[in-house]
Amino acid sequence: MDKKFYIAANWKMNASLSFINDYFSFLDSNAENSNEMIICPPDIYLESVKKTAPNFIKTGAQNISSNNTGAYTGECSGEMLADNSVQYVIIGHSERRQYHQESNEDIKLKLLKAIDSDINPILCIGESKEERESDQTFDVIDKQIRSVLDSDILSKDIGLLIAYEPIWAIGTGLTATPEMANDVHLFIHSMLSEMTSMSIPIIYGGSMKESNAKELLEMEHIHGGLIGCASLDASEFLNIYNIAEEIRNG
């Protein structure tokens, strides 16, 4: 299958120095690298990950400030992330939207800061359980995309990834079927095709794990995964990555 996969680990607020050393000791001796592997640790560990990870692994941040500098306690600017050789940044994750009340307008500002800093954005979008049950999935996603991505942004080669994360399938034990996920990815793909001629990979962020990765990644419009809990186990994360390798090279 001639499709490049992007397998991204979102460690959220987890990890330690010993965890990082053990994690990459395991990956270094076991991983292939024809697809993109991205590790997004807490900011405090970005430098440690960069120093410890095999060279083929890309580093990503979990957030970026919408400001360049100033009295914004706890924030980290795009310039600071770039100084740490960060290559990707997660923007608009459902937990940021929920716990930090980030709006689509906030998310667009953050995406622009990532672009200014030459950091590839991973833009997260997705619907809640209530929105899915009331058949609003496509309306919600349409609004999230159009509120953030305009023609000027889409005219630039910014290395954008879209991560579809159905909120109802994150940390709940619920998972979208591969067909359900692919249908939404197809909608996003069709929508983006009308907005830009560039090909934008769309990855799945709804509790991908080793047991469902093959079925999901074999779907035509799923180009990888943004993986939370399962990425904290180096063996499971590597197995997911290797599934992507087998699909691409098999």
Where are these regions (language model features)?
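Active-site loop-to-helix "anion-binding N-cap" substructures in soluble metabolic enzymes
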Residues: 1-250
